[in-house]
Regions:
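Rossmann-like AdoMet
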Residues: 1-3
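S-adenosylmethionine/decaboxylated-SAM
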Residues: 6-177
Length: 177
């Protein structure tokens, strides 16, 4: 697990701020680094819902949020697999969905994000370049193929306006129109 870098984090903060985000879903809590960036861009009353399979990750993230002075009511930590948790979240309720979880599930995360997002909402995927493997057709491992297919699906989706940002390991961002 490698946390998002400062460039990617700054983009997440900017995106959350730009759309005055009140409700954000994060897939892959990690140690809370990307969650802190998102929270810093959200409205003061905004709530981050963050999902991770690892209890230790969520414990570390909770500690990071507390140390950063984030009010406990602004963060909802949900343990579990994203594809078990996301279907239980409210349709059309979220302003941003950020995915940095299991790369082989990115296409499924996209389907859930489209359901969860309000019109005008933003979906973002970290590691969209996957160590420069996505552009190399000879690379056929499961993660690379999944991320490559995600890029194609986002580009071709009629209700998404996408951009691939060459920040860190690539940040694929799309607005739901």
């Amino acid at each position: 697990m490698v946390p998002i870098g400062s460039g990617g984090g700054a983009v997440l903060r900017f995106l959350a701020s730009m759309i005055d985000a009140r409700a954000v879903v994060e897939i892959g809590t990690g140690t809370g680094v990307s969650g802190l960036w998102l929270l810093r861009g959200m409205r003061p009353d905004g709530v981050l819902t963050t999902v991770d399979t690892e209890a230790e990750h969520q414990r570390l993230a909770k500690q990071a949020f507390r140390e950063a002075g984030i009010a406990p009511q602004r963060v909802r930590l949900i343990p579990g697999a994203a594809l078990d948790v996301l279907p239980r979240l409210t349709d059309g309720h979220y302003d941003v969905v950020f995915a940095d979880g299991d790369k082989t599930e990115y296409a499924d995360y996209l389907a859930e994000a489209l359901r969860l997002l309000k019109p005008g909402g933003i979906v973002a995927f970290d590691n969209a370049l996957w160590h420069d493997r996505v552009a190399d057709p000879a690379q056929r491992d499961a993660e690379t193929v999944s991320i490559r297919e995600l890029g194609k699906a986002v580009r071709e989706h009629e209700s998404l306006l996408p951009v691939l940002l060459p920040i860190g390991d690539g940040l694929l961002v799309a607005k739901k129109i």
